[in-house]
Regions:
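Rossmann-fold cofactor-recognition segment
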Residues: 48-66
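Active-site helix of classical SDR
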Residues: 117, 153
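Conserved glycine-rich cofactor-binding loop
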Residues: 12-13
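Residue(s) in the substrate-gating loop at a strand-loop-helix junction
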Residues: 137
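C-terminal helical subdomain
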Residues: 177, 193-230
Length: 245
């Protein structure tokens, strides 16, 4: 028997694809949401054939926030779990020269994800059950010259998830904040990432599935990142501002 569905936003991303396999393996029906969702037809067919679960495709644009309420209303079934894997790394130097890419990064990493989860939060609250998962970033723990546009948006998203968790804690709805650290994905392709600090998409998916099952609040996919960010955040601003980070 197929379990209640999991809704994956940003379903084309490597992490979302790994999550689709992880939840389908557990017998969960899947709702895959992305722009140009029809291009995920081969993924849909493979998941259904491989795991024997129902998989549906849903057109979704994170930046078209005026459509988010209708998107949720038109779902064939309200999911039990919703995971937002929407994000855009962008190029920091381009964002410093031109506000257009900067705003796109901010909207893709904060406004869009927060908007759709806010809509779902209201539906989950009315039902008094469900789990919302937001994939944020350790980059949001402290602003750094090398990625402060992206980091600032993730900082906002992390704060949003914290507040949402506080609001819904006694309403039967759980909120999970995921801080992956480096992940080997298409988004980071070409970057020199330290292997010891870099997770694979399947590793992130397993950590998220476990966090949902155990009702964890905030997770670092690799625990070493908790230590690293504790150290980074403890450096006095008078010293930190002169560091090359």
């Amino acid at each position: 028997m197929t379990k209640p569905p999991v809704l994956l936003f940003g379903a084309r991303s490597d992490i979302a694809k790994a999550l689709a396999h992880r939840f389908a393996l557990d017998g969960r029906a899947l709702q895959l949401a992305a722009r140009n969702a029809a291009s995920l037809e081969s993924d849909r067919a493979d998941l259904e054939l491989r795991y024997g679960v129902s998989v549906t495709l849903h057109e979704f644009d994170a930046l078209a926030t005026d459509t988010h309420a209708d998107f949720v209303r038109q779902l064939p079934e309200l999911p039990e779990i919703a995971v937002c894997a929407v994000g855009l790394l962008g190029v920091q130097v381009d964002s410093e020269r031109d506000t257009e890419p900067a705003v796109r990064i901010m909207r893709s990493n904060y406004e869009g994800p927060a908007s759709i989860l806010a809509v779902l939060a209201n539906s989950f609250e009315s039902r008094q059950s469900g789990t919302l998962v937001g994939i944020s970033s350790v980059a949001g723990q402290r602003g750094r010259a090398s990625n402060y546009i992206y980091g600032s948006a993730k900082a906002g998203f992390t704060a949003f998830l914290s507040g949402l968790r506080n609001r819904l804690a006694k309403k039967g709805v759980h909120v999970v904040t995921v801080l992956p650290g480096f992940v080997a994905t298409q988004m980071t392709d070409g970057m020199r990432l330290p292997p010891a600090l870099t997770a694979q998409p399947a590793e992130v998916a397993a950590a998220i599935a476990q966090a949902v099952a155990r009702k964890r609040n905030v997770i670092f996919v690799r625990p070493v990142w908790r230590l690293i960010m504790t150290v980074v955040c403890s450096i006095p601003e008078s010293l930190f501002k002169n560091m090359k980070v």
